[in-house]
Amino acid sequence: MEQYNVTGMSCAACSSRVEKAVSKVEGVTSCSVSLLTNSMGVEGSASPQDIISAAEEAGYGASLKGKDSSAKNASADEDMLTDKETPLLKKRLIASLGFLIVLMYFSMGHMMWGWPVPAVLEHNHVAMGLIQLLLSAAVMIINQKFFISGFKSLLHRAPNMDTLVALGSGASFVYSTYALFAMTNAQMNGDSAGVMSYMHEFYFESAAMILTLITVGKMLEARSKGKTTDALKGLMKLAPKTANVIRNGIEETVPIEQVRKGDIFAVRPGENIPVDGVVIEGSSAVNESALTGESIPVDKEKGYTVSAATVNQSGFIKCEATRVGEDTTLSQIIKMVSDAAATKAPIAKVADKVSGIFVPAVILIAAVTIIVWLLLGEGIGFALARGISVLVISCPCALGLATPVAIMVGNGVGAKNGILFKTAVSLEEAGKTQIVALDKTGTITVGEPKVTNIIPADGVSEEELLEEAYSLERKSEHPLAKAVLAEADKRGIKAHEVENFAALPGNGLSADLNGRKIFGGNMKFISSKVSIPDKIKTEAQKLAEEGKTPLFFISDNMLRGVIAVADVIKEDSPQAVRELQNMGIRVVMLTGDNEKTAAAIGKQAGVDEVIAGVLPDGKESVIRRLRSQGKTAMVGDGINDAPALTRADIGIAIGAGTDVAIDAADVVLMKSRLSDVPAAIRLSRAALRNIHENLFWAFIYNVIGIPLAAGVWIGLFGWKLNPMFGAAAMSLSSFCVVTNALRLNLFDIRDSRRDKKIKQNTVKGGEMMEKTIKVEGMMCPHCEASVKSALEEIPGVEQASASHEAGEAVVTLSADVSDETLKNAIEAKGYKVVG
């Protein structure tokens, strides 16, 4: 996706106009414009020049975002997000208020409350009118941006909010100017009644008040919108500007864009790490909270990776740069959050469609309002006031901002907590999850075996057993051996040199230690060497049932003991699973382990269903089957999880996983904590709830406000709206929507106390029976739909799914249905059942 900066947009109608114009360019497959970040994301083969030209022809400016260096890009993007609008609006507001206060004094203070005026103006109605004209003209000149933008958009046949303001204020001014000339003519003709009549037709104060109140609203809106991008700006500010690079043995400070892959750089305590790298010398504790939200420092030593923008807290380290420029973790996070802001959530489509026709519709309603009141016999002043009220109370911005502000704030909250949503779609859809499929290794479990139990034989201490096991296992490359080595290192146990080491495939290890023959391996192998006491056998079997692997060790034909090794579950996994279940989500664990081991891990984690013996290439088909039962999220971290992550409705990658898994996912968890999965879903639900609130108030505001402004209720209740109050309401509407979205910043994504179960149309694995049928002849999705509908018409079939790629159909049964019945239903549609 190519990113562009866009200038000149003032409301949702503007962004809609740019989007439509660019989407028409040949070669553009998708276009999404963000009013909040003044940016545009475009996909397709169209040239940048054609895209920029299309935006310019629509009346707006566009430029391609630079790609020269992450530091320059971060600085440029940060500059684009900097709130330059609020200071300018503040100056305009102060100047406008100065003239407006004087105008209100002359137009209302003197006329309504008899406030004193200079003697030369006393009873001089023409002079009073002329002063009001000049004062209101001054306010209009100060706020000329509304007129320039509004009428320019009108000429491009794409009216926007500025057009409504310009028409409303302009109409008030033009009619008042006409009334002033008419009053002057009446005074010259000695028509005192005409003078008094026209004097009450002045709307100069309305013209100025509309502009001033809209400016107030714009300033509040700009300030609030600026806060919605705080998280993104905060990430950009983290980008280091310089690095201490060592070249030819000399340390020098260079701009960050000059750092190249393979450069050696030094980082002292208190300094930010400039680029991603690997430690080659020294050790330290690094604060990674800027990227992961985790405040506890992480120990780093030789061979450990470090990331840009994290803080070296204690020791001096030297590192080799592995990722620089746009490839650093920080740059990727910034890009991910920025790209998400440039995308649109499905729920925004309705508001976008309305925004696209809203302004022309309002102009038409205002014109009809004026004509109807004139036909009903009301004066031009009354009719015009109703039409102007319609123009200035209508607010397309509230509709246009309802979704993007909530998406932006939600993405910011996620980023601050180490949860990255790649698109607005993923932020919206994650909260609708009904089934969560968890890969076992590295997701539920730590991902590397650890020693869990040490059971020494009689007369042997734990240290003695571990010492012999350490000496034997240190020459093995097996993952289980590494667990024994890590435990011995942790306890400070020293290994002894062994001789005649041999690895016996499928059995175990053997070696000579100080003249003694030692063996290590599984129960079957060791049982062939010595007799194992029943007590030890029983304990070993119990460990195996818990999903642990018991390793037996003997020396000189004497059992020395058992060391149990297992890939232990993460501390937060059971709690995370409970939270998901409390949210009404069914939790399924996928693993390639045997059923006994899988069941043990599943029981510890508390999942609803365990699917064991799943080969790496089989995860994708399992996810496809689960999707037929409900909206499914897949959580994984490895390369073999990528197809399943892509197939799932929502793919969630654990941050410590591979780049391939992260690329395939819709949501990335920077920390390796499973508890971030319910947190992400919780945040998604909160964001969606906020969007619904915003859309409701934006729609209801216009539904109530426009008829009130048009005078629909005058006959029934006598209600009518002064244009000035309409302008005030318009000013506050967008501000209220943005402020409501900012409430998401206060949302605690870890608080599970308010979780609500949502009604799910899922099928519990233990309550239903599932059958897989091999089918020949399916060639396309239409074939799949035919087979699916045929099966679901059979009584007792709760759900069915079919895949022409896999050549199979899967049915979930709530009652006993014979294979013959299923076969006949499929073959009646012209397909062949082969198994």
What are the functions of these language-model segments?
Residues 88-242, 353, 718-723, 729, ...:
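Transmembrane helix-loop-helix hairpins at the membrane interface
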Residues 26-43, 49, 201-202, 233-327, ...:
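Conserved cytosolic catalytic loops of P-type ATPases
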Residues 186, 192-195, 208-269, 300, ...:
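Juxtamembrane coupling segments of multi-pass membrane pumps/enzymes
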Residues 91, 310, 431-477, 507-588, ...:
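ATP-driven catalytic headpiece of P-type ATPases
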Residues 16, 29, 269, 433, ...:
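Conserved ATP-binding TGD loop and adjacent catalytic N/P-domain core of P-type ATPases
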Residues 1-129, 152, 250-251, 335-343, ...:
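Flexible metal-binding regulatory segments at protein termini and peripheral loops
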Residues 112-126, 155, 174, 413, ...:
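Membrane-embedded alpha-helical bundles of multi-pass transporters
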